[in-house]
């Protein structure tokens, strides 16, 4: 859909108009203008109780005196000074739902007049677009009967004062790029595991080179990884007939060609049955989402290339499968990682860290400015934080602060977990340098502590998205998180 920012006299708009009204008869500035233009029409509707201003109410007006608009959407927003970001999202969703039912093709929105604490018009517009695009998303590639794609709404105009239009246009640019990145991440993550295997993931990575001439892609197969001594990564893949493949996506657009790159590493378990430590059958189908870390890194790289930010960024998609088979690795096995450290396997379902530890060692060759890994790593993180905040662990205070700031800017929320030396005690093994699990307590933290052993040569952060990467129930599907958070982080780094 086309988004734009313009400033047009209310009396001259001949398409469709969206106005905000609040409880207790309060009107937004443009709603006041409309009331004056229509000789008190809106005031009379409030007086007789037709318009309440309560959140969730959307009233459609037609044939209004002194107004050329086809329709006026009067949107109830609740208490003017108590609107939260969550409520703002709900207001946008309800408004779009109503508009689509009318078959309107063009709308002019004044909802950016809604005031939110510590938010500006840039945020209002950007968040509105991301919400609108999310409401349009559907994944029906494998359905014989496709969803309704016949919406006639093709232009959404934000009415913005001239002095704010440059900022509004920048918000539109950012929002559209991020929304595209989120969509691509969702599409890959929602794809079934009989289609989306490590080779498919690598093919998607290679397609990015066609999207942008700033991107080059290298794919490492099992032969190349064996030559690099990535035996921990390869052990996880032993039970699968599908070859493990690690895709390295290089984006280079920094004015200084020698500038150190930012590296993003995504866990790409295209299906995780748990291996010999087999998972319960209930909801095992959702383990196709164990590659959401890689999918989100793909989405970020897509958004990055669309925005052409002046950065050097490398995205790594660490793809493989963890399945039970006569060739599968076993509890009790001792693996030698690429770093040389040995790991005793106590549970084959704690496989993500075994893949990531070698990927995190591999990226040392790029002499990175910093490294962020993204992974659906632990159920313990879901127990600790639920499904609203991603878990953040970091060895660098400044990096942690920057990521939390990006999370706050985008509402792609994250919460920092501790990382102190005591947690390493839980990872001790009688037979190897490390055990791959740390016992029952603090599982999300001990998983991060395990990875920290392989990140000593650069600033590092870890995002555990096990609780935020997908939804369950009637709204089942990938969320595309944390594409928004990480893209905002990169935008901030480029300034």
Swiss-Prot record:
Q: Name one GO molecular function term.
A: manganese ion binding
UniProt-listed GO biological process terms: proteolysis
Q: How is the cofactor bound?
A: Binds 2 manganese ions per subunit.
Pfam families assigned to the protein according to its UniProt record, in alphabetical order: Peptidase_M17, Peptidase_M17_N
Q: Where is the active site?
A: 279, 353
- Cellular component terms per the entry's GO annotation: cytoplasm
Taxonomic superkingdom: Bacteria
| Compartments (UniProt record) | Cytoplasm
- EC category name: hydrolase
- SUPFAM superfamilies listed in its UniProt record: Macro domain-like (SSF52949), Zn-dependent exopeptidases (SSF53187)
Q: Which UniProt keywords apply?
A: Aminopeptidase, Cytoplasm, Hydrolase, Manganese, Metal-binding, Protease
Quote the EC number. Answer: 3.4.11.1, 3.4.11.10
Q: Does the keyword Hydrolase apply?
A: yes
- Chief location: cytoplasm
Q: Show the PROSITE patterns listed in the entry.
A: CYTOSOL_AP
- What job does the chain carry out? Presumably involved in the processing and regular turnover of intracellular proteins. Catalyzes the removal of unsubstituted N-terminal amino acids from various peptides.
Q: Which HAMAP family match?
A: Cytosol_peptidase_M17
Family the UniProt entry places it in? Belongs to the peptidase M17 family.
Its name, as the record gives it, is Probable cytosol aminopeptidase
Species, as recorded: Histophilus somni (strain 129Pt) (Haemophilus somnus)
Supply the source organism's classification: Bacteria, Pseudomonadati, Pseudomonadota, Gammaproteobacteria, Pasteurellales
Q: Supply the gene name.
A: pepA
């Amino acid at each position: 859909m086309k988004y734009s920012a313009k400033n047009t006299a209310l009396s001259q708009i001949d398409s469709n108009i969206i106005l905000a009204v609040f409880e207790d008869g309060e009107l937004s500035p443009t709603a006041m203008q409309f009331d004056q233009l229509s000789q008190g029409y809106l005031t009379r509707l409030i007086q007789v109780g037709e318009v309440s201003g309560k959140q969730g109410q959307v009233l459609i007006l037609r044939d209004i005196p002194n107004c050329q608009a086809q329709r006026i959407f009067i949107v109830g927003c609740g208490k003017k000074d108590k609107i939260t970001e969550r409520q703002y999202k709900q207001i946008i969703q309800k408004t779009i739902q109503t508009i689509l039912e009318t078959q309107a093709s063009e709308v002019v929105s004044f909802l950016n007049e809604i005031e939110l604490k510590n938010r500006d018009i840039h945020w209002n517009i950007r968040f509105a677009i991301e919400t609108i695009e999310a409401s349009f998303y559907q994944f029906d590639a494998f359905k014989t009967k496709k969803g309704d794609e016949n919406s006639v709404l093709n232009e959404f105009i934000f009415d913005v004062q001239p002095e704010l239009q440059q900022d509004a246009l920048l918000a539109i640019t950012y929002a559209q790029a991020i929304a595209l990145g989120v969509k691509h991440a969702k599409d890959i993550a929602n794809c079934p595991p009989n289609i989306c295997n490590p080779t498919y993931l690598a093919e998607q990575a290679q397609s990015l080179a066609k999207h942008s001439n700033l991107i080059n892609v290298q794919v490492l197969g099992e032969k190349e990884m064996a030559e690099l001594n990535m035996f921990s990564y390869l052990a996880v893949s032993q039970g699968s007939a599908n070859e493990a493949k690690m895709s390295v996506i290089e984006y280079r657009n920094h004015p200084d060609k020698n500038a150190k790159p930012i590296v993003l590493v995504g866990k790409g378990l295209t299906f995780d049955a748990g291996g010999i430590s087999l998972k319960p059958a209930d909801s095992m189908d959702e383990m196709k989402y164990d590659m959401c870390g890689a999918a989100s890194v793909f989405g970020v790289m897509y958004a990055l290339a669309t925005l052409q930010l002046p950065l050097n960024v490398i995205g790594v998609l660490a793809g493989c499968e963890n399945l039970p088979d006569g060739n599968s690795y076993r509890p009790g096995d001792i693996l030698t990682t690429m770093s040389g450290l040995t790991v005793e396997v106590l549970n084959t379902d704690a496989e993500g860290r075994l893949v990531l530890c070698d990927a995190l060692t591999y990226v040392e060759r790029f002499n990175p400015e910093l490294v962020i890994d993204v992974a659906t790593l632990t159920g313990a993180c879901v127990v600790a934080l639920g499904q609203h905040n991603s878990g953040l662990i970091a060895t660098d205070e400044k990096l942690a602060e920057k990521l939390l700031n990006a999370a706050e800017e985008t509402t792609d929320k994250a919460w920092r977990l501790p990382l102190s030396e005591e947690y390493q005690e839980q990872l001790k093994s009688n037979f190897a340098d490390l055990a791959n699990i740390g016992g029952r307590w603090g599982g999300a933290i001990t998983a991060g502590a395990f990875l920290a052993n392989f990140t000593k040569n650069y600033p590092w952060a870890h995002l555990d998205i096990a609780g935020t990467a997908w939804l369950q129930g009637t709204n089942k599907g990938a969320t595309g998180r944390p594409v928004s958070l990480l893209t905002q982080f990169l935008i901030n780094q480029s300034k």
